[in-house]
């Protein structure tokens, strides 16, 4: 993947100003609510029976934060994202058996929550850079499935 200097700057800026404790839980909660079949991978998280329960679930919040911190690794290794996520790809495919399409669903939810947080600052250029970055991460996480 080729990154322009502008794309690198946008991605770095987004993640350097991101409120992980806010964005992470909101993005994962949105994914679990909008795409309820994704809940099957979180059966150990307790009550996921409705939107209110999911939004208030401490395990969901903690995992959402963990996911965003995992994306930090990609931001710091933009020239080698596939290798950065190779071990995580193996874990999700061979042990957890996560449908790789779920990574795309979560990345879409992250984009929506970031867009809502940034408001007018979430320009088309910002969206393009963020979605490109997340698509590369999603591809890397799905490598083990191929």
Swiss-Prot record:
Keywords, alphabetical: Heme, Iron, Metal-binding, Oxygen transport, Transport
Origin: domain of life: Eukaryota
Residues that, per the record, bind heme b: 63, 92
Residues in Globin domain copies: 2-146
InterPro entries in the cross-refs: Globin, Globin-like_sf, Globin/Proto, Hemoglobin_b, Hemoglobin_oxygen_transport
Tissues expressing this chain: Red blood cells.
Name of a matching Pfam family: Globin
Any one GO BP annotation for this protein: hydrogen peroxide catabolic process
GO cellular component: blood microparticle; haptoglobin-hemoglobin complex; hemoglobin complex
Family assignment from sequence similarity: Belongs to the globin family.
Subunit structure, interactors included: Hb 1 is a heterotetramer of two alpha-1 and two beta-1 chains.
UniProt miscellaneous comment: This fish has two hemoglobins: Hb1 (major) and Hb2 (about 15-20% of the total). They display the Root effect and the alkaline Bohr effect, which is enhanced by organophosphate and to a lesser extent by chloride.
The protein's name in its UniProt record: Hemoglobin subunit beta-1
